[in-house]
């Protein structure tokens, strides 16, 4: 992109130079005046600074050293014929060296083609040296120095202020860990105090072993020859847990013969089927609706009648209960007779004896003769 810009900038002065040469050949005095004006503008340092400001900030590497610029001396004016021959010679040389860039100087000035070529080669050589340098590996562990580190400075094009950037590595560890080939395991450095604390104390050993020096307990002969009594054997037997939930239900609940021989009806089979879960909110919380019709009274009477017992039904026990002879000969005591009588329900105020008030239980108070003789206030 930079090369195309240089070519476009270079082609523009070439066209201007060609136009000036034609004007000079035709004898146009404006060509000579413009050439002289261009030469004065280039040689004038103030004009040159204004031109550089109009062109904008360029690459600082493309600027020529001050000694090279100072070494070039351009004549004030030249003869038109000599200037034309000089321009043709420079153009032929640029075509031979394949240089698309042409200086913006006027015809009356000497073109610094050799100086520009040397500066360009010098910049290329400097750029190649920068690219040839290996990149900095920030993952290598290095000690951070206390003095100024590596950095670079630049001048802001908008503000005339100096900026300085200090480059510190952002990572202070390395991905490769150095393997120690001398040791297979890590041996920590244990101090003498740590070794003393790691030894078990004698008090704890005696406490846990019940003051026994050996794990084999000595058993006396009397304990070996002792015969346990029946009570001790009964107490030594483990208790059977009375877990009702863990016992098999076949031993607890026995199905009767009538339940085994029962034949379910169609209604029972219908009720035994599981209901489908409701999906709508109205089904979960139904709103009671008024009955559209009155139920049949004859149907209710039919349902109220006792059903006849089926011949296949085998009851668990005889409906006629057998009364024992001992029960028939029992004589009831007066206490049992009093308890057998039902309580007589009375009304709310029937047979209720209210507790007498204090004024009703005591005699009415009487005033003393002294109080009777005293004059009453207000009379």
Swiss-Prot record:
One of its GO terms (biological process) is spermatogenesis. THEG repeats lie at residues 118-137, 184-203, 222-241, 258-277, 290-309, 326-345. Testis specific. Pfam families: THEG (PF14912). Residues 56-76 have a biased composition (Acidic residues). InterPro entries: SPMAP2-like, THEG. The keyword Phosphoprotein applies. It comes from the Eukaryota. The modification Phosphoserine is found at residue 295. Residues 1-82, 344-379 are annotated as: Disordered. One of its GO terms (cellular component) is nucleus. It is found in: Nucleus. Residues 19-29, 38-50, 347-356, 368-379 have a biased composition (Basic and acidic residues). Keywords: Developmental protein, Differentiation, Nucleus, Phosphoprotein, Repeat, Spermatogenesis. May be involved (but not essential) in spermatogenesis. Interacts with CCT5. This is Sperm microtubule associated protein 2. It comes from Homo sapiens.
